[in-house]
């Protein structure tokens, strides 16, 4: 599989291990940055866009009480803008789950 095709996958991100030891006032902003970093690493795109619902979920318990885990859908898409520097971008959106137990990475069928 090449990193130049559009694809959608579901991942669980353990934010607790990425934020452990972080100052309280930096936790929610760092969580957003860590989700972007995770998406860049996994999808191989520099341009990562966070969905509004995912951002609200990360900030839902305040600046210092970030959820331990978050389930996200990462969609790599083609950039329609002609003069864009990056040909592909990634959209990170929230997936609501009752429990994180037993979940694995899975490919989502494209629309």
UniProtKB/Swiss-Prot annotation:
UniProt keyword annotations, A-Z: Ribonucleoprotein, Ribosomal protein
GO biological process: cytoplasmic translation; translation
CDD domains: Ribosomal_L31e
A GO cellular-component term linked to this record: cytosolic large ribosomal subunit
InterPro entries noted in UniProt: Ribosomal_eL31 (IPR000054), Ribosomal_eL31_CS (IPR020052), Ribosomal_eL31_dom_sf (IPR023621)
Domain of life: Eukaryota
Keyword Ribonucleoprotein listed: yes
A single MF term (Gene Ontology): structural constituent of ribosome
Disulfide linkage: none
SMART domains: Ribosomal_L31e (SM01380)
Coiled coil spans: none
PANTHER family: 60S RIBOSOMAL PROTEIN L31
Family note: Belongs to the eukaryotic ribosomal protein eL31 family.
Protein name, as recorded: Large ribosomal subunit protein eL31
Species this protein is from: Dictyostelium discoideum (Social amoeba)
């Amino acid at each position: 599989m090449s990193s130049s095709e559009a694809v959608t996958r579901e991942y669980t991100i353990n934010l607790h291990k990425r934020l452990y030891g972080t100052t309280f006032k930096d936790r929610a902003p760092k969580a957003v940055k860590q989700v972007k970093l995770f998406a860049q690493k996994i999808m191989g795109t520099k341009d990562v866009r966070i969905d509004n619902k995912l951002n609200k979920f990360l900030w839902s318990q305040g600046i210092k009480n970030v959820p331990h885990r978050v389930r996200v859908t990462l969609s790599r898409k083609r950039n329609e803008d002609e003069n864009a520097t990056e040909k592909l971008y990634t959209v990170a959106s929230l997936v609501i789950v009752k429990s994180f137990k037993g979940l694995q990475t899975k490919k989502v069928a494209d629309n």
